[in-house]
Amino acid sequence: MLFRSDSLVFAIQKAIQSTPENSIRVQATIAAYFDFIEADGEAFRLLFESDMNVEPAVRERLNRMTYDCAAAVSAVISLDTGLPQEAAMLLGVGLIGSAQVTARHWLERDSKLTRVQAQNLVTNIIWRGISGFPRS
């Protein structure tokens, strides 16, 4: 699973580069998280929800993965809104955190919502929030 964290970063970068349309970027980013989590749910649970994540090397890898994903998102936010990098990074971390936590929740609960329904709900709430920032 540790090497797969690089595949998540790549998937997020690919989602962002896939289109200039920000609503589709958000949708693709959320889908990338659900893909990542669903591909190997047991390994994901072990890594994120067990004592493994207190190990310094594992924790560092998880933090790096989150930072790299948020940095990819924040670059677009900063460019589109003119927000300073620090503010854009905070929003990027929030967006990535929301995607990660909601995808985990969906997986953990063996939800009656289909994956597509869950992704659409999360995409909708995140897009409605981030799209409120004026473009520069």
Residue ranges, per PLM feature:
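Hydrophobic alpha-helical connector segments
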Residues: 14-39, 95, 119
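Short, solvent-exposed positions on alpha-helices
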Residues: 20, 24, 45, 86, ...
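Short secondary-structure transition hinges
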Residues: 24, 28, 35, 39-71, ...
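Charged/polar, low-hydrophobicity segments characteristic of intrinsically disordered regions
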Residues: 128-136
